[in-house]
Amino acid sequence: FAYVDFSYKLQTSGESALFLGLKGGGNFYSADPTALSAYLSVGDPSQVSLSKFNPNIGAGAYFKATNYWVSFSIPRLFNVKRDSDNLAVTAKDRVHTYLGGGVDLPVSNGIYIKPSLMIRKVKGLPTTADITGMVSWQNQFDIGLSIRTNSSMALMSMISLGMFDVGYAYETPTDNGLSQLNLRTHELVLRINL
C-alpha cells in the first residue's frame, strides 16, 4: 500500500485546536500462482495471475481542548473489491467509521484519570467500542486498561523521555472462542515528538 497524508491545524482559541486530515493513495495487489512449483504438473484453471491497484481516499477531524478531545474519521471512503473475472473467491475492503472522545480528569497534584471511548462501525458487522482508562502521573508516566467489546482487553503503559515516548501493551482475547487460539500480542511503541 502507499498513501500520502495531509493535515491542517486550525487554532480555535488559545487552548484548543481543530485538526483536519485527508489521505489519498491505494493498495497494490499482485499474485502469480502459476509461478509456484508443484509436485504434480496438473494445471488449475482457477489459478490466474492478478495485478491490481485499488485507489482510495480518507478524511478525519480531531478537536483538542485543554482537558478533552473528540475525533471522527473514515480512513477509506470507498468499498473496494479485490477480485478478478477468473477468480472464484472475492474479498471486499469495507468502509470503517470511527468516532472517539476522551477527557483528562485531575485527581490530585499531577495525577490524572484519562477515560476515553472509540466507537467503530463497519457496514454489515456489529458496532464495537474500545473503552480505555489510563492513569497519568506528571504527564510522564501512564498506565491503564482497555477493553474492546466482545473481543479483547489490553494492559498499556507509556513513559515520556524528553522528545521520545516509549510504550508497551499486552493484549489478550476475552471471547471464549478466540481464547483457545494464541492471539495474545505484545506491542512496543516508540514515538518521536518533533
Language-model features, listed with the residues they occupy:
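Subset of outer-membrane beta-barrel
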Residues: 1-194
